[in-house]
Amino acid sequence: VMNGKDKISVIIPCYNVQKYIMRCFDSIYSQTYGFENLEVILIDDLSTDNTWSVLESLQRQYPENVISLKTQK
């Protein structure tokens, strides 16, 4: 519990979403609930574009709130 609110986990499966994932993330980030009360779990399903690089970058930028995972073949 943070600031009297329950923490919410947002799970986003990803496959070749390099073009769209930032728009999705920005939408989550701007929610009135407060980003500090969110845990965003991004799961890359072996994308063939640069999705994984974007997810890693988000995790580095927001280490307290973002977890990036990559499925294994």
Please name every model-derived segment.
Residues 70:
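Short loop/edge segments at beta-strand edges and connector loops
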Residues 24-26, 37, 44, 56:
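Generic preference for flexible, low-structure residues
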Residues 5-8, 29-42, 50, 63-67:
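Short loop->beta transition adjacent to catalytic acidic/histidine clusters or analogous donor-positioning motifs
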